[in-house]
UniProtKB/Swiss-Prot annotation:
Organism encoding this protein: Caenorhabditis elegans
Family label: Belongs to the DEAD box helicase family.
Lineage: Eukaryota, Metazoa, Ecdysozoa, Nematoda, Chromadorea
Composition bias, Polar residues: 552-561
Protein name: Putative ATP-dependent RNA helicase ZK686.2
UniProt KW keywords: ATP-binding, Helicase, Hydrolase, Nucleotide-binding, RNA-binding
InterPro entries reported for this sequence: DEAD/DEAH_box_helicase_dom, Helicase_ATP-bd, Helicase_C-like, P-loop_NTPase, RNA-helicase_DEAD-box_CS
């Protein structure tokens, strides 16, 4: 009886734990138990054989292992095993970005506004060349004019403007500055405008001259490496300006100079930074901390004493064509309750970057829809010849060719001059040119005396050249932002423009990948130029290469290849930048013995 009862107990225990014939049956049986024994009737008809004690224990171990593998419960922790979970990036949308004022990036009759739509101060006259307001101007100017007519009692809100190249951003701060200066002469410095390159300084000064009335009430001074430092200092001392347009390095040089009198920033009303993305990540250590310190009132909330003395922090206006991609970096500018004016994706080539999105504006660049892009793929040894054929085939009047290195510009200029004899003039513009030589060369190009201008990226930012028909990337740009800035030299103010990029099969692969990631590939046309296409020009091309080889060999013997281009104007000397290391000499107290 005892053995019979043990057998019955064993049968009862094994009704729910029948070992199947194959390995997959373990999982089937576990599923059956989990589902509430729905198939009890069919299983009950089967007769289970008695199991030995060792078999039961082995079956239990298998069940534990399978259960742990399925993630239902973990019996033992496996040493060295780490469970990783993919977490979604936290997306934060700043309120000032979410409430941005948008405008169309396309300039045409449907988006432009009549001049009567904006009421200008009486002392400002509209130049005859301007017939309408562009979208960015119509969006920004009314609010800035209102603050000038009715100044807020406390610190005004700062402004960030993200608009495509050639959309008319410069007027968005030129007119408010002239309105703040007023119609009566004064010796108060109202605005400081900072730009990254010398050529842009001269361009902005010319824009002020266009809008300033005949009496010239507003005194505008340019400070850059194109002028002699001591001459600039004497000009500042004899006739204090209302507006300063400068490069950051030259402004710091004047602010820290021992030549009296110093520039007074205590009553500054506008601090404007054009092409802000070009200023670099060390701009705060190099010059921004110094300017904010001398302005005063930027590190604390305005108090009653500041209101009585009419001393307040200046209003910052930050502009760039790629500003919307660098929304995170705007924190470096220490903007006060900023207002964002941004181009919309409607009627514009919207370029969404592949970087993680912080908000709905970050990661976007805008390129005018009037620009067409073509990618020419050929062997590197035929690149100069491909550029020559593209220029002559399309009959461009003004062509800007971008290169990455100075040596490339010299070689390409020599070859194109040989190929283009008796057809058109070719010249090259690099950062090694100083003083008047820069402006003379740009003036010749604007007057169409030079049909082709080879340049480095010193002209890729902000510089407005007259009616550039085509931009050629002889060396492909390293990133999408540089591509947008280069392309922005053509197709300005709603005009048609063409961009031609030249590369080989290897560089094409990386370049196309970059454009597709940022949705810049779009309507790009790809053209393959095989060797037989160049046969008609091969004799002239061979002679040009022989001439280049002889010139390089001659320069190597005489050392001429190492000589820097002859400079005119003042002799520029590179100085160390102590502030780049985070030093702030203006904060150091003078020690008394």
């Amino acid at each position: 009886m005892k053995r019979k009862n043990q057998k019955e107990d064993s049968d009862t225990e094994n009704d729910d734990e029948i070992e199947p014939a194959n390995g997959d049956g373990i999982e089937q049986e576990m599923n059956r138990v989990t589902n509430g024994n729905e198939d009890d009737e069919s299983v009950g008809n089967d007769v289970a054989e008695p199991m030995e004690t060792e078999d039961v224990e082995d079956s239990g171990e298998v069940e534990i292992e399978e259960t742990a593998q399925n993630g239902e419960r973990e019996i033992f922790k496996v040493l060295g095993k780490q469970e990783m979970k993919n977490l979604e990036a936290l997306k934060v949308t700043s309120s000032w970005v979410q409430n941005a004022t948008t405008f169309s990036a396309t300039i045409d009759s449907s988006t432009s506004q009549k001049l009567s739509q904006i009421e200008l101060p009486e002392h400002l006259t509209v130049p005859s060349a301007i017939s309408t307001w562009f979208p960015v101007q119509y969006a920004v100017l009314p609010s800035l004019f209102f603050e000038i007519r009715s100044p807020p009692p406390l610190r005004p809100r700062d402004v960030a403007i993200a608009a495509p190249t050639g959309s008319g951003k410069t007027i968005c701060y030129v007119l408010p500055v002239l309105a703040a200066v007023g119609s009566k002469p004064s010796k108060i410095l109202q605005a400081v405008i900072l730009v990254p390159v010398q050529t842009l300084v001269a361009q902005i000064v010319d824009e002020f001259k266009r809008w300033n009335d005949e009496s010239g009430v507003a005194k505008v001074v340019s400070l850059s490496g194109a002028n002699d430092f001591e001459k600039e200092a004497r000009q500042l001392a004899s006739d204090p300006p209302n507006v300063i347009v400068a490069t950051p390095a030259r402004l710091v040089q004047h602010l820290t100079s021992k030549i009296p009198p110093p520039i007074d920033l205590s009553k500054l009303r506008f601090l404007i930074v054009d092409e802000a993305d070009r200023m670099g990540k060390l701009m705060r250590e190099e010059w921004l901390d110094l300017v904010e310190f001398l302005c005063g009132g930027m590190e604390r909330v305005a108090c009653l004493k500041d209101i009585i003395r009419q001393r307040r922090a200046p209003q910052k206006i930050v502009l760039s064509a790629t500003l919307s991609k660098d929304v995170e970096e705007l924190h470096l500018w220490n903007l006060f309750k900023p207002r964002l004016f941004s181009a919309t994706a409607v009627s514009v080539k919207d370029i969404t970057s592949g970087i993680p999105q912080v908000d709905h504006v970050s990661g976007r660049l805008a390129l005018p829809s009037s620009i067409s892009h073509r990618l020419v793929v050929t062997d590197p040894k035929f690149h100069p010849l491909a550029v020559y054929q593209q220029i002559t085939r399309n009959k461009f009047n003004r062509t800007l060719i971008f290169v990455n290195e100075v040596s490339s510009s010299n070689r390409l200029a020599h070859v194109l001059k040989e190929l283009c004899k008796d057809q058109f003039e070719v010249d090259y513009f690099t950062a090694q040119l100083f003083g008047k030589r820069r402006y003379k060369m740009l003036e010749k190009f604007n007057k169409n005396e030079n049909r082709v201008l080879i340049c480095s990226d010193v002209l890729a930012r902000g510089t407005d050249l007259n009616k550039v028909d085509c931009v050629i990337n002889y060396n492909l740009p390293a990133d999408d932002k540089l591509f947008v800035h280069r392309a922005g030299r053509t197709g300005r103010a709603g005009q048609d423009g063409y961009v031609i990029s030249v590369g080989d099969k290897e560089s094409k692969r990386l370049f196309v990948k970059m454009l597709k990631v940022t949705n810049l590939w779009g309507d790009t046309v790809e053209e393959q130029m095989e060797e037989y296409i160049f046969e008609k020009d091969m004799d002239r091309y061979s002679k040009a290469l022989e001439s280049l080889k002889a010139t390089v060999s001659s320069q190597a013997k005489t050392g001429g290849s190492r000589q820097i281009a002859k400079r005119s104007g003042f002799e520029a000397k590179r100085k160390s930048r102590p502030n780049a290391r985070g030093e702030k000499p203006w904060l150091k107290k003078k020690t008394t013995e």
